[in-house]
């Protein structure tokens, strides 16, 4: 069994290699100094920092139009990769809502417990984070018309599996101000196969996502290939969870999956119409 430090080192090396093609696309995005400082903070967890070369957090948030005075909603924060950046960045002048996953799933409950322990106990660093819930029957993620930016990272497949993706996107639409932005990152499904409405393998077709968002009332205003990974064939034994960072197969074929890297992901920017 690889120890934790070695695994992080191997994962970091793999992600750096994976990021070569996407880095050029991300490098063209100019990031403000405060956001760069939040990403570079020594207080972030080493395991999260190790993923930065492939996730391009500062560039992605800049692409979505993040600003320090905004009201921002993060959906289903998981372990807090993005919260650890957004919280300090927004603490002084912004407002930050986090819509947690509903209780009842053991894995999600564990993540939520760890998230609460880390982020609600340090108001000086993370500011006042307003907690709400998204799904399966709770969709008031923030006061209607209050948010400048709503963000979801690799969550849409979960809402599809739960049967409430349309309601989740409608909640995002309601929470945003006219002209507000909805940013979506998700594992990109293959276009040569029909979309599983439950997204059981964790992949969602980009065109399917765009159609869902338009059905909710959004207009597509941008897309980015900064998280593209052409090595991801999307036919893995355990779906997207076969690949890093989950590596669901344990030691079996680990080197192969590390060589592939994290999944191929799309980044889409939607806007709530101004009128």
Task: For the regions a language model picked out, list residue spans one by one.
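S-adenosyl-L-methionine
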Residues: 110-138
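Helix-to-beta-strand junctions that scaffold the AdoMet/dcAdoMet cofactor pocket
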Residues: 90-91, 159-160, 176-177
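Class I SAM-dependent methyltransferase Rossmann-like catalytic core
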Residues: 35-63, 67
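Conserved class I S-adenosyl-L-methionine
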Residues: 68-78
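A short acidic, Gly/Pro-enriched loop at the edge of an enzyme's catalytic core
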Residues: 140-150
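C-terminal lobe and adjacent flexible extensions of AdoMet/dcAdoMet transferase-like proteins
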Residues: 257-275
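Conserved beta-strand signature within the Rossmann-like core of class I S-adenosyl-L-methionine
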Residues: 97, 179-187
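A short glycine-rich, Lys/Arg-flanked "PGG" loop and its adjoining helix->strand segment in the class I
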Residues: 87, 165-178
């Amino acid at each position: 069994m690889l120890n934790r430090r070695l695994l992080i080192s191997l994962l970091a090396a793999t992600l750096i290699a994976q990021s070569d093609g996407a880095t050029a696309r991300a490098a063209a995005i100019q990031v403000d100094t405060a956001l760069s400082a939040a990403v570079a903070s020594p207080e972030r967890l080493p395991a999260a920092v190790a993923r930065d070369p492939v996730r391009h957090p500062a560039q992605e948030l800049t692409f979505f139009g993040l600003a320090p005075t905004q009201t921002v909603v993060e959906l289903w924060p998981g372990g807090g990769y993005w919260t650890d950046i957004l919280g300090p960045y927004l603490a002084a002048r912004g407002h930050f809502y986090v819509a947690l996953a509903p209780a009842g799933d053991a894995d999600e409950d564990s993540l939520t417990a760890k998230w609460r322990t880390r982020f609600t106990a340090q108001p000086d660093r993370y500011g006042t984070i307003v907690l709400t819930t998204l799904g399966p029957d709770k969709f008031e993620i923030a006061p209607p018309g209050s948010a400048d930016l709503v963000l979801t990272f690799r969550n849409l497949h979960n809402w599809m599996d739960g049967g409430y993706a349309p309601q989740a996107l409608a909640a995002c639409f309601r929470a945003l101000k006219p002209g507000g932005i909805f940013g979506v990152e998700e594992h990109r499904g293959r276009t040569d196969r029909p979309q599983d409405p439950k997204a059981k393998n964790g992949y969602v077709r980009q065109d399917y996502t765009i159609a869902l968002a338009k059905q909710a009332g959004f207009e597509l205003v941008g897309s980015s290939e900064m998280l593209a990974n052409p090595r991801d064939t999307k036919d893995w034994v355990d779906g997207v969870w076969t690949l890093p960072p989950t590596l669901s197969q344990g030691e079996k074929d680990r080197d192969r999956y590390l060589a592939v890297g994290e999944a191929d992901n799309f980044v889409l920017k939607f806007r709530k119409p101004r009128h």
